[in-house]
């Protein structure tokens, strides 16, 4: 969506300062909540990554973990990857974890897009997916796991030691755990790309809070737990939600079915599929073209947004041709184990589980994989123990720079609409605005990534975080339809909008060329 200089300027000039006190954005205490079971995905999407026997791209600087061969590299995070990291770190393996992110989908994996997890043991009142992942990540880090929020681009498990190459480093290792999860499927409607992030989304929790969806009629496609959960979540913001189900019944759990069917703000359309998107003369999404699967009858349903909840595809492309996969792309493991067809390579989580796909089963498989790695290393006389002190997290002092009286433009990082108005009108620097929402897991992933890049250009950039629920008028004027979203301004001109989570080098290159 094109955002005019006039609209943003008007919003920044007219919006009254918020009277409520807001906590300051403190980048150093933000813990990344990375890529879940969907890590390493840019590479993963790239079956385009070079094959092992092809010429590999130039190697990045070697890992600073040491010049030797590491015990274990874990590719991916989520409940499988983080659990594996916890067990491996406690066993003194000092695992190297590439958390990565999911290109074209939702960083942090499926739990990062889940509102309430009500069936994970130990949380009688439930827990949000991002909060659960945050706790797991901190636990892995506390016991000595080496975490890198980087995208894996190349894997060679055909020769030893194995080689894992990310966007920033190369690591050699004796064993690998693949916990890359699965990516959200798309319908591939004729106009899907045109309206992706402009009305179509695969993440209700990321994009549902957008001011452009509030009070509107929305639709969700799918009949399982993911789709029903998205429909329920969207009723917090939408006037009404339509759930489109291809078959004549829901596949979701009985509890989720009851909640959907008894919700007056949700209408379920059985035997119905989406055929395409309909737009108005302004080029905005105005509806969905539907088709009955039983009669073939077609109709148009007026909605302002369409959300997908139609399942996932395993992120195993990096391993194609190197380990055994089934016809759907899931990694094949020996029954009851995490062992793949390659000795020393193990798989955990949704990348090898096409049946259960639960957070607790993913965590269990991560545990099995880590214990299997330890046995493998011992049996082959490869284990080198690293005894590290347990890392205790220190409380960070939180200061509020962004209330009107305390604002200081000499600082680089700020939060809230008052700060944005000040830097927008007064700063000669490039202005980077990050739009977030409270329940957005990918926002937690992006904050530390972007923060590190901003630190590199401290004298050339001003950074402001905007919570779209606290400052909806700013988000609406900027045309924000989902979070996370980054906009760059200079001299009151908007230069670029970047939706979702990207690699550090993409933000770095843009800032470098526009500072």
Curated annotation (Swiss-Prot):
FAD binds at residues 77-80, 98-99, 106-110, 119, 152, 206, 350, 357-359. Pfam families: Pyr_redox_2 (PF07992), Thioredoxin (PF00085). GO terms for cellular component: chloroplast. Expressed in roots and shoots. It comes from the Eukaryota. It is an enzyme of class 1 (oxidoreductase). It catalyses: [thioredoxin]-dithiol + NADP(+) = [thioredoxin]-disulfide + NADPH + H(+). Disulfide bonds join 203-206, 440-443. The record marks 227, 245-246 as: Important for activity. Binds 1 FAD per subunit. Its EC number is 1.8.1.9. Thioredoxin reductase (TR) that exhibits both TR and thioredoxin (Trx) activities. Contains a C-terminal functional Trx domain. Functions as an electron donor for the plastidial 2-Cys peroxiredoxin BAS1 and participates in a NADPH-dependent hydrogen peroxide scavenging system in chloroplasts in the dark. This is Thioredoxin reductase NTRC.
């Amino acid at each position: 969506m094109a955002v005019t200089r006039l609209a943003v300027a008007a919003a920044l000039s007219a919006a009254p300062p918020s009277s409520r006190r807001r906590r300051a954005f403190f980048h150093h205490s933000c813990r990344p909540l990375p890529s879940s079971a969907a890590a390493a995905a840019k590479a993963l999407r790239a079956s385009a990554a070079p094959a092992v026997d092809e010429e590999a791209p130039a190697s990045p600087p070697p890992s600073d973990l040491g010049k030797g061969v590491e015990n274990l590299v874990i590719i991916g995070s989520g409940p499988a990857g983080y659990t594996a990291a916890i067990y491996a770190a406690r066993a003194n393996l000092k695992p190297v974890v590439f958390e990565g992110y999911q290109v074209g989908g939702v960083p942090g994996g499926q739990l990062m897009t889940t509102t309430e997890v009500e069936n994970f043991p130990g949380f009688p009142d439930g827990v949000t997916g991002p909060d659960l992942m945050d706790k797991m990540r901190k636990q892995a880090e506390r016991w000595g796991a080496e975490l890198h929020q980087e995208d894996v681009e190349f894997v060679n498990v055909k020769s030893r030691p194995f080689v894992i190459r990310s966007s920033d480093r190369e690591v050699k290792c004796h064993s690998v755990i693949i916990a890359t999860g699965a990516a959200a499927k798309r319908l591939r409607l004729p106009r899907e790309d045109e309206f992706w992030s402009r009305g179509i989304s695969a993440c209700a929790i990321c994009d549902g809070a957008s001011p452009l969806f509030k009070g509107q009629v929305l639709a969700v496609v799918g009949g399982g737990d993911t789709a029903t959960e998205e429909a329920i979540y969207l009723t917090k913001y939408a006037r009404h939600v339509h759930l489109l189900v291809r078959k004549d019944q829901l596949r979701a759990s009985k509890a989720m079915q009851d909640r959907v069917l008894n919700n007056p703000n949700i209408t379920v359309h059985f035997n119905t599929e989406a055929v395409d998107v309909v737009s108005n003369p302004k080029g905005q999404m105005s509806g969905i073209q539907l088709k009955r699967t039983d009669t073939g009858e077609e109709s148009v349903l007026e909605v302002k947004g369409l959300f997908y909840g139609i399942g996932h595809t395993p992120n195993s492309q990096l391993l194609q041709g190197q380990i055994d996969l089934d016809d759907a792309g899931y990694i094949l493991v020996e029954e009851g184990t995490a062992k793949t067809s390659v000795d020393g390579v193990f798989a955990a989580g949704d990348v090898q589980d096409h049946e259960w796909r639960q957070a607790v089963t993913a965590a269990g498989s991560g545990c099995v994989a880590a214990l299997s790695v330890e046995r493998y290393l011992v049996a082959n006389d490869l284990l080198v123990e690293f005894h590290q002190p347990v890392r205790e997290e220190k409380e960070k002092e939180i200061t509020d720079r962004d209330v009107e009286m305390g604002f200081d433009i000499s600082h680089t990082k700020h939060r809230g609409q008052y700060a944005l108005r000040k830097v927008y009108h007064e700063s000669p620097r490039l202005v980077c605005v990050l739009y977030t929402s409270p329940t957005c897991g990918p926002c937690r992933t992006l904050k530390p990534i972007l923060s590190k890049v901003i630190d590199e250009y401290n004298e050339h950039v001003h950074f402001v975080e905007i919570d779209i629920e606290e400052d909806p008028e700013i988000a609406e004027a900027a045309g924000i339809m989902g979070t996370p979203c980054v906009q760059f301004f200079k001299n009151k001109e908007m230069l670029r909008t970047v939706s979702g989570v990207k690699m550090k080098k993409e933000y770095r290159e843009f800032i470098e060329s526009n500072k």
